[in-house]
């Protein structure tokens, strides 16, 4: 499906707009650059992208956050972004560099970390914390495989007077992961 590339340094910026072809996305990757002395705006970016995805018809929408952590500069709470993420139907996937020595310092960073944690859990997404930016490429390759091999399962229960309390889904191979939204 269509893919877009959004930068989060200083403010959310569309680097490559939604396109089904890889050429525009590859060109956008060439325009990604560091923005020193500015805080990331992860909360705002997820909020904006989720709002845009809610207006689009998409079979399997996903938001992928690739971040080196650091200070959050959105200045807002996580709840609105979490609500919009739910309304969009998108899954949230996060790959982030985490330094073992880094601690959460301010409220905005705690808000971002809460959004990433709850967003992944609530949407059936995934999160991978890596210790160095050199691990981004293998982590993104794993995520690409995960996204490429997803299937939508629709379940309709038989008409009974008392509905079942739960639905159990199993896989023949233990290598399969099940996620639900």
Model-derived segments and spans:
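Extended, alpha-helix-rich binding/interface surfaces that flank or overlap catalytic cores
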Residues: 108
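Exposed acidic/Ser/Thr-rich ligand/metal-binding surfaces
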Residues: 9-103, 114-117, 121, 125, ...
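C-terminal "exit" segments of structured domains
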Residues: 132-181
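His/Asp/Glu-enriched short active-site or ligand-binding loop at hydrolase and phosphoryl-transfer sites
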Residues: 127-129
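Conserved alpha/beta-hydrolase fold motif
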Residues: 3-5
């Amino acid at each position: 499906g269509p893919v877009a590339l959004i930068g989060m340094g200083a403010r959310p910026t569309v680097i490559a707009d939604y396109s089904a072809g890889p050429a525009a996305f590859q060109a956008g990757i060439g325009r990604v650059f560091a923005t020193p002395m500015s805080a990331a705006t992860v909360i705002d970016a997820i909020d904006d992208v989720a709002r845009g995805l809610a207006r689009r018809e998409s079979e399997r929408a996903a938001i992928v956050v690739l971040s080196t952590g650091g200070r959050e500069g959105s200045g807002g709470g996580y709840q609105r972004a979490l609500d919009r993420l739910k309304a969009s139907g998108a899954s949230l996937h996060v790959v982030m560099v985490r330094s073992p020595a880094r601690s959460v310092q301010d409220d905005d960073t705690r808000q971002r970390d809460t959004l990433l944690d709850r967003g992944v859990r609530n949407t059936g997404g995934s999160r991978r914390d890596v210790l160095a930016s050199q691990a981004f490429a293998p982590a993104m390759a794993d995520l690409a495989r995960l996204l490429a091999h997803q299937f939508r399962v629709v379940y309709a229960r038989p008409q009974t007077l008392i509905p079942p309390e739960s639905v159990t889904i199993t896989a023949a191979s233990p290598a399969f992961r099940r996620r639900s939204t």
